[in-house]
Amino acid sequence: LQGGEKVDHSTAGAQVAARYGQIPLAFAIAGHHSGLPDGGGRSDTAQDATMFGRLKKSVEPYTQWTNEIKLPSIPPQPEMMKENRFTQAFYTRMLYSCLVDADYLDTENFMSSPKPRGQGQTMDELLKRLNQYTAKWSHPQGTLNQRRSSILSACTTAGQTGRRGLYSLTVPTGGGKTVASLAFALSLAVKNHMDRVIYVIPYTSIIDQTADVFSEILGAENVLEHHSGVDYSAKEDDEPAAYRKALAAENWDAPVVVTTSVQFFESLYGNHASQCRKLHNIANSVVIFDEAQNLPVPYLRPCVAAIAQLVQHYRAAAVLCTATQPALQPLFDELAPGLQMTELCPHPKEQYQAFRRTTLKMRGELEQSQLGAELAAQEQVLCIVNRRKTAQELYNNLPKEGSYCLTTLLYPAHRKQLLQEIRERLKDGLPCRVISTSLIEAGVDVD
């Protein structure tokens, strides 16, 4: 401490845990500063940084601890450890998360005065705020509003009567999916004494609008955004609300977390302490995967395997929420036999007919110049293309007044500004021509 002589307490602690037969705990102790080590092999030497190497390493004698500390009885490992290697690895990560977060918090409390952590409202209080917000929809006017109200009511009832498990919410565009999923999540959390709601979104292009909706309903102080577009510095001289959110972002100690698929799954499969601190706080949470059809196909198996672990072993509930539900049940059947998905939306096929607002017409091949001329002739139009270069070329040939180009090359703040301008022009009935790549297809609201 304070510049004194360093000792390899990580390796020493791991060796003690290994002697007690606690290999997952040994991994966690060995990596609580440098990150979870690779297991390695029995041929590894003491010079290797693997787990096998660390267990062979000679460290300074430390037997004196036995005269000063008595280890508590170590409980047997959970039954899940008999399942398979993946389950064992996942359990090790959760154990590691508990250790590194506790280590950070203990050090923080020792080195400084207590910090403002865990100050959000309870699930009960948030559910009351949601009910107050949705009370204005209790007497819906018009067929579509009645259907939205029916979907919201069905999700609320399912949460009030449901248990932890795997769910799907298949709601067509315009059906009120965001608020309905929140109603289910909070109702389920209250009924089953769960800790938080985590909303996982594939793209940063829609994360702002979701966080804004939740903040309006629940209060900004209860909603944590955590993704690459948000910078948290955790400096004590920051504005108090920003400082509290910076602290909460370290371990997701917040009632509602809005994050990206990248942040969520890379944390589950990462090995650094800063990534893994939050993992134990995913346990006993309701996790909503918005736009679930956009789970990356090359990584679909590890994503589904992680979701199954959270539901089966860590008291979580998962909701796959989308307007175009992917066929994931067969993959769950393969990776987690017996884990069945329950649909929350009443009569999904019927809802699609009611909310249908588009007509498909096959135009065949169009020259880009012809397409550009047709777009320029429209007062309000949206054109989605599959290449950024094409989007820019089409945009360059449109009248500059009221024309917009949306691609992933835009900074998030600039994209947010343009979307707000688009919404205002549509609201005011002004000319508005939007050329976009597929980023707008993932649920971006423009009206």
What are these regions (language model features)?
Residues 1-132:
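Accessory nucleic-acid engagement/destabilization modules that flank
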Residues 162-185:
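Walker A/P-loop
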Residues 194-218, 230, 327:
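Conserved Walker A/P-loop ATP-binding site and its immediately adjacent core
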Residues 196-207, 374-399, 403:
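Conserved strand-helix element at the start of the C-terminal RecA-like helicase core
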Residues 219-269:
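Inter-Walker segment of RecA-like/P-loop motor cores
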Residues 225-239, 386-389, 403-420, 435-441:
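Conserved helicase motor
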Residues 302, 308-309, 357-389, 393:
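Conserved interdomain hinge at the start of the Helicase C-terminal
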Residues 323-377:
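Interdomain hinge/linker at the junction between the two RecA-like core domains of SF2 helicases
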